[in-house]
């Protein structure tokens, strides 16, 4: 990934459309991109999502008439901010709101510019197949606009019902969709994948037959986070020892924003020794509320010789830019880029995922 990140190519065609409705929707999408990039409060994001739905319902001529008459904000659900973005797009004016939002949400790579230039993709992302906010196609096009060569789509497995996790039938449908999109987007590649739940006994929430069909498997703990340290250690080791698992996701499960959540307790030496033994990468999760693992555990994973993956865990296109933090963190930790698996070209990466040792 080289050069500055730029979201606008994803929306450029619609922003330049002759149809005022398409321009308005693209401008709202761009606002949502920046809001997601800036980890905006959910209420703000919902306001723009609602405005996008409202605009889609009223049609081009009604929209143009309301903007001309200054009555756009008379519509329930259209406020001053959303109204200004829509009106500027309809009238083909530069949007001060979008410009300010873009400036305020730039992601600082810090000392990680060198690592960022070497990254070729992101191995942890979600779409509306589970709890993401956008389609596979939109996430992929956004990743491509950021300079990525590939994006792994890793929606949740069925056990995580709160996130509308995929059972095997729905996952098979998604694989068919990805196959068609790859034909359209080549040479960019959407890698098939899943963030599979590590069950309480260490088993994975997907059959080995289905796991073997996937390009990238991220295994994560989402339940019983406060279980006994010894049992959690056993649970995690069983998962990373599975040759179908490529990445151990957000290993402590901590949350560091809002009400927060303490990290799970496990014997990190044993878990990271297993990651090194079975060549399973430890994820550096870039989500602002996670940023997991912390420095001391990252250092320990490196001491054990683990590979790492710098991933956003993005649930929306703008969140794909959160890799900037992870690159800075990796640089500050002195991580050799050769140990970062998403610096590998796609074919080399897939060769690695297919070659994990067995017990």
Task: Pin down the residues of each PLM region.
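Short conserved micro-motifs on helix faces and helix-strand junctions that flank
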Residues: 76-77, 121, 152, 310
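Charged catalytic cores and adjacent phosphate/nucleic-acid-binding surfaces used
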Residues: 2-20, 73, 84, 95-119, ...
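Ser/Thr-glycine-rich phosphate-binding loops at phosphate-binding pockets of nucleotides
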Residues: 123-128, 150-154
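Core AdoMet radical
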Residues: 152-153, 194-196
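Short beta-strand elements
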Residues: 190-192
């Amino acid at each position: 990934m080289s050069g500055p990140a730029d979201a606008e190519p994803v929306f450029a065609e619609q922003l330049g459309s002759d149809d005022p409705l398409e321009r308005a929707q693209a401008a709202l999408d761009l606002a949502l991109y920046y809001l997601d990039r800036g980890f905006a409060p959910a209420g703000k994001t919902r306001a723009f999502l609602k405005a996008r739905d409202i605009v889609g319902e009223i049609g081009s001529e009604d929209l143009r008439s309301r903007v001309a008459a200054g009555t756009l904000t008379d519509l329930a659900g259209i406020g001053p901010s959303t109204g200004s973005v829509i009106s500027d797009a309809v009238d083909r004016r530069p949007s001060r709101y979008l410009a300010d939002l873009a400036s305020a949400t730039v992601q600082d790579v810090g000392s990680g510019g060198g690592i960022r230039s070497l990254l070729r993709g992101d191995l942890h992302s979600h779409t509306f197949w589970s709890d993401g906010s956008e389609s596979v196609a939109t996430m992929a096009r956004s990743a491509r606009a950021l300079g990525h060569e590939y994006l792994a789509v890793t929606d949740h497995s069925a056990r995580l019902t709160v996130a509308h996790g995929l059972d095997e039938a729905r996952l098979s449908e998604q694989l068919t969709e990805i196959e068609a999109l790859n034909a359209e987007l080549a040479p960019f590649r959407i890698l098939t994948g899943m963030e599979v739940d590590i069950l309480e006994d260490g088993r994975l929430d997907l059959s080995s037959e289905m796991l073997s069909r996937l390009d990238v498997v991220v295994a994560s703990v989402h339940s019983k986070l406060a279980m006994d340290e010894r049992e959690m250690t056993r649970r995690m080791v069983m998962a990373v020892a599975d040759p179908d698992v490529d990445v151990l996701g957000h290993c402590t499960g901590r949350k560091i924003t809002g009400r927060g959540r303490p990290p799970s307790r496990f014997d990190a030496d044993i878990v990271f020794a297993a990651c090194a033994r079975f060549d399973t990468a430890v994820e550096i999760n870039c989500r602002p509320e996670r940023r997991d693992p912390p420095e001391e555990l990252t250092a320990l994973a490196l001491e054990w010789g683990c590979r790492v993956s710098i991933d956003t865990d993005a649930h929306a296109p703008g969140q794909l830019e959160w890799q900037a933090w992870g690159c800075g963190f990796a640089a500050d930790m002195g991580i050799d880029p050769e140990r970062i698996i998403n610096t590998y070209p796609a074919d080399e990466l897939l060769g690695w995922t297919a070659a994990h040792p067995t017990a």
